[in-house]
Amino acid sequence: MNTQTTPSPQFYLTAPAACPYLPHEMERKVFTHLVGPRAAEMNDILTQGGFRRSQNIAYRPACESCRACVSVRILAQEFEPTKSMKRVLAANSDVIATEFAAQPSSEQYSLFRRYLDFRHQQGGMSDMTVLDYAIMVEDTHVNTRIIEYRRREEGSGLEERPKGELLAAALTDTMSDGLSMVYSYFNPALERRSLGTFMILDHVRRTKALGLPHVYLGYWVQGSRKMDYKTRFQPQEHLTPRGWERFDPSSMPESTHD
């Protein structure tokens, strides 16, 4: 009897490089390609195991002397917004969110560039071209969508792409157990709207509506101020050597970063 076996994914290790989050640390990553008919299934398994997706690559930290990067996921069905989060929702009551296929636009790239130039001038993405952005959005073999957030105008919702200024966007994977926020960006001039927080709250709402348990936020690095905001969304679980465990935020200082 002939049996067919599905090839196992091949994993690779990057060379050491300077850590973008913690000074004096070096990072390494283990990665594999997400391609073929099992790409979506593998993305589910690997994300639940602490990997992140970037284009058709799934990766996770494999640093020799540091374990600071911790995978975080919100328990969406138990989540209730805090008073400050309710204020964020109220401040963005004029925003309409629309989901599209993972296709880039010049309008998206213009906003993406404004975000990078303001928030990540020295980061590894700072020199991304319009072609780089298009590849980031389109190069996916899993169930990926892009969600646009626009200021609501008269007639919005009656067309395929609503009218109104594009305020923010999120590249999102739908998985068997929830949503994974691959990358999000927003207009940095609209600080009072806390659009970063608003997009996470919207993903929690969407996950609840789907009847799924988790919103994956990527990595949290204790000691990195730019990551502190992720611990505000409770309850949440962190991936430990013992598996996913509920996180106790009582020891963490409250952050106002959005």
Swiss-Prot record:
Its main location: cytoplasm. Disulfide bonds: none annotated. One of its GO terms (cellular component) is cytoplasm. InterPro entries: Acyl_CoA_acyltransferase, Asp_Glu_LeuTrfase, N-end_Aminoacyl_Trfase, N-end_Aminoacyl_Trfase_C, N-end_Aminoacyl_Trfase_N. It catalyses: N-terminal L-glutamyl-[protein] + L-leucyl-tRNA(Leu) = N-terminal L-leucyl-L-glutamyl-[protein] + tRNA(Leu) + H(+); N-terminal L-aspartyl-[protein] + L-leucyl-tRNA(Leu) = N-terminal L-leucyl-L-aspartyl-[protein] + tRNA(Leu) + H(+). It is found in: Cytoplasm. Its EC number is 2.3.2.29. The keyword Cell inner membrane does not apply. GO terms for molecular function: arginyl-tRNA--protein transferase activity; leucyl-tRNA--protein transferase activity. It holds the Pfam family ATE_C. NCBIfam families: PRK01305.1-3, PRK01305.1-4, PRK01305.2-3. Belongs to the R-transferase family. Bpt subfamily. PANTHER family: ARGININE-TRNA-PROTEIN TRANSFERASE 1, ARGINYL-TRNA--PROTEIN TRANSFERASE 1. This is Aspartate/glutamate leucyltransferase. The lineage of its organism: Bacteria, Pseudomonadati, Pseudomonadota, Alphaproteobacteria, Hyphomicrobiales.
